């Protein structure tokens, strides 16, 4: 009798997990979930282009899931860029660039992936966001195209709805993107070389 009860409970729990993972999820990630970046920026000017597609981006990693991260990623990465550059303008297109001797950076989302407990048999939800940063100088010459992956997962999805779990994983992924941008941007060799050239030109003038 005891074994029968355990079997029934286990079956009910498995059904609950499967049902939760197979349901649809429309996720809206809010800006308020991200703290202000505290970082000392370098004496570099940059024009950051967040175009309409980026600002309004809604990921559809599968036919049952949509994740609206447009405003959240604009806010999060905008804060991170402010921690990198002492002089910054956030604009919507290259036509609005007003700085000279500056970096012009256009972020874009290449891919968003989601993994649920039904995919991995683990009690976690995971989100991967693959960013690309197109980096030019103010004359329109390309400096680099930098690939920046970000990852987030829930510590435990038990007692979370599918929508809430994916939202939590997406928030962690966006925070990961902001942290990587702050830590790794000036380690890009082409950025370092550009800064050296600009410094030499400034010394010659």
Question: Where are the regions that the model predicts?
Answer:
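Sec-exported extracytoplasmic/periplasmic mature domains
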Residues: 81-86, 90, 178-190
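Bacterial N-terminal signal peptides that target proteins for export
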Residues: 1-10
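A structural "domain/chain start" motif
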Residues: 21-80, 187-205
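Mid-chain, structured segments of secreted extracytoplasmic proteins
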Residues: 72-97, 107
